[in-house]
Amino acid sequence: MNILFCSAGRRVELLKDFRKSMDDGDRIVAADLSELAPALYVADAHYLVPRIDDPSYLDTILSICRKEKIDAVTTLIDPEIALLAQNRERFEQIGVEVLAPYAETAELCFDKFKMSQFLAAHGIPTPDTWGDYASAMAAVAAGELAFPVFVKPRTGSGSVGARKVHDADTVSYTHLR
């Protein structure tokens, strides 16, 4: 099996551990936008690629898949999951399995508010969650929510932007920009 790890970054140990489970003749190919990404250099082959939001990115990845006879592709960063999921058919047309959730599931997982609603609808307890500033402030006015609160962007990963805030002005300043 030949597998392509997109956005390989610093995941050297992950690639090394993955290699331990592979058979002789199997290959790891890594791609990243930075030549400084250490995981590139533990792969059997590596490629420098554009940013995932570059219009040529997907065609670049598909080209690598064809050239390296890739059997499966996955990503090591959250924002790219949706891109692979939404383009699953293009990969399947060239015989490449996408190791990522389907597009609907990827969208659900990347949107914290939608995930909270989904979990609540299925009886899975979650912290109280508001999807926007206005509804959160209405909950404060109704006495359903009190400061301090924990806020984080509705989408994103790596806890970027997650923080404890003590007042409405901070919530507004932090999350309405």
Question: Where in the sequence are the language-model features?
Answer:
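A conserved helix-loop-beta module that forms one wall/lid of the active-site cleft
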Residues: 93-161
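Pocket-edge positions in alpha/beta enzyme catalytic cores
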Residues: 49-53, 107, 163
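Conserved small/polar residues in nucleotide/adenosyl-binding loops
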Residues: 174-175
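Active-site donor-binding loop signature of nucleotide-sugar glycosyltransferases
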Residues: 51, 153, 167
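Short amphipathic alpha-helices within nucleic acid-binding modules
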Residues: 171
